[in-house]
A protein has these predicted regions:
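Acidic anion/phosphate-binding donor-loop and adjacent secondary structure
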Residues: 139, 170, 187-207, 375, ...
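Donor nucleotide-sugar binding/catalytic pocket of nucleotide-sugar-dependent glycosyltransferases
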Residues: 153-196
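Glycosyltransferase donor-sugar binding loop
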Residues: 191, 247-261, 278
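Conserved donor-binding/catalytic core segment of Leloir-type glycosyltransferases
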Residues: 211-227, 233-236, 249
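Nucleotide-activated donor-binding/catalytic signature segment of Leloir-type glycosyltransferases, i.e.
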Residues: 260-286
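Short hydrophobic beta-strand element within catalytic cores of glycosyltransferases
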Residues: 294-297, 317-321, 327
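Conserved acidic donor-binding segment of nucleotide-sugar-dependent glycosyltransferases
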Residues: 332-344, 350-357
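A charged, aromatic-enriched C-terminal amphipathic alpha-helix characteristic of glycosyltransferases
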Residues: 359-385
Length: 388
């Protein structure tokens, strides 16, 4: 790393990281109470915050995940409703800028920044984990960019999941040197303990009406434009022979609905493509992933991918573009990377997967995921909460 990179804290598998005991997260020597923190927003479909909060509690932090907040004053309202905790740990901020109502207004952004100022004036520490550089559908919206710049400058600590993310954040938003010094790189934990990652693969295929023979390529998750599912169908169809009984399984809810209609039109011409265009209940997610031999995530744009870590946690190798944090953080012996700027590269990656020992890659994927324990990550996060 360059000398101006600022502090970088790592909590990576195989590296020793100090893990404080139950009282280590308390506020100073002999403190009467532990640090209290809220993590928001929390969504039912994403266990990231719940897993982190559970690990933080083991470190002595009183951590609560927040899934509801007052519309008019989300940050201040959530902080007050949870007893004015010491730390407000933000993740995605779209819902605090107007959410589904469209792009944020100047008033939304100013109010968001004012709430950050108010929280800090009341003694709260602001922590931000950067999952995306900007909203997936935000484009080059200058007002959303202003909100991110405000958060970067106000935050007491900024957590990123790879060094490339740190570099990209600096390139995009040009933060002050002081803000750069508050950026820290921590690992992204796995989902091994959250799901039935050892679900029987043969039974999973039977439940989905898939033959036990042949390679099953799968995409799993919400189907949005930036995820490139249309390009995946085109690459699969153009790839020709991917082995006897090869199938492409697409599972997830299209957003917006027109994407689903486009996929149905394409799939109608290729009987090897199986569509399940609906939201996958959490209890069925493991079955879908275990039915696959390899999970394909053809993002057009991405920083970090919980979906990739989810697949690897289920012992399934991934096919992904060499974008964002993926080349730096995913295991090279359990992932097949391709050049997103080469229009033929995805089809080539599918052929490479078809010829690979996917079972061996899957075993390596699971071993890697087993090493991504939330404990060391929570220990470092608690340290940032304390401001050590």
């Amino acid at each position: 790393m360059p000398s101006d990179a600022g502090p970088v804290l790592t909590a990576q598998p195989g590296r020793e990281t100090a893990q404080p005991g139950p009282k280590a997260a308390q506020r100073g020597p002999g403190a009467a109470r532990p640090v209290r923190a809220i993590l928001l927003p929390s969504y039912a479909w994403n266990p990231y915050q719940r897993l982190l909060a559970a690990a933080l509690r083991e470190q002595g932090v009183e951590a609560a995940v927040v899934s509801e907040w007052p519309e008019r004053s989300p940050l201040m309202g959530a902080w007050q409703a949870h007893g004015k905790p010491d730390v407000v740990h933000l993740h995605w901020i779209h819902d605090f800028l107007g959410g589904s109502k469209g792009r944020p207004s100047r008033r939304n952004v100013l109010w968001f920044d004012w709430q950050l100022r108010l929280l800090k004036s009341r003694g709260a520490r602001i922590v931000w984990t950067v999952h995306n550089l900007k909203g997936h559908e935000a484009g080059d919206d200058p007002r959303e960019a202003d909100a991110h710049r405000a958060l970067i400058e106000r935050a007491d600590a900024i957590i990123l999941h790879c060094h490339r993310a740190r570099e990209a954040l600096i390139e995009l938003y040009r933060p002050s040197g002081a803000a750069q010094a508050r950026m820290h790189v921590l690992a992204h934990g796995s989902y091994v303990r959250q799901y039935d990652v050892d679900a029987d693969a043969a039974s999973a295929r039977e439940a989905l009406g898939l033959s036990r023979a042949g390679t099953v390529f799968a995409f799993v998750g919400a189907i949005r434009g930036y995820k490139g599912v249309g390009e995946l169908l085109e690459a699969f169809t153009a790839s020709g022979d991917l082995g006897p009984d090869a199938r492409l399984l697409i599972c997830g809810k299209p957003l917006p609905a027109r994407i689903g209609r486009e996929l149905e039109e394409h799939a109608a011409a290729d009987p090897r493509i199986v569509l399940r265009l609906e939201r996958i209940p959490e209890e069925d997610l493991s079955r879908v992933l275990r039915a696959a031999d390899v999970v394909v995530l053809p993002f057009r744009d991405i920083l970090t991918s919980g979906s990739a870590i989810l697949a690897l946690s289920h012992g399934r190798p991934v096919v992904v573009p060499a974008l964002g944090c993926l080349p730096e953080t995913l295991p090279a012996d359990a992932a097949i990377f391709y050049d997103p700027d080469d229009p033929d590269a995805l089809a080539g990656a599918l052929h490479r997967a078809a010829g690979a020992d996917l079972a061996a890659m899957g075993a390596r994927a699971r071993a890697w995921a087993d090493g991504l324990d939330w404990g060391p990550i929570a220990a470092e996060t608690a340290r940032l909460y304390r401001g050590d």
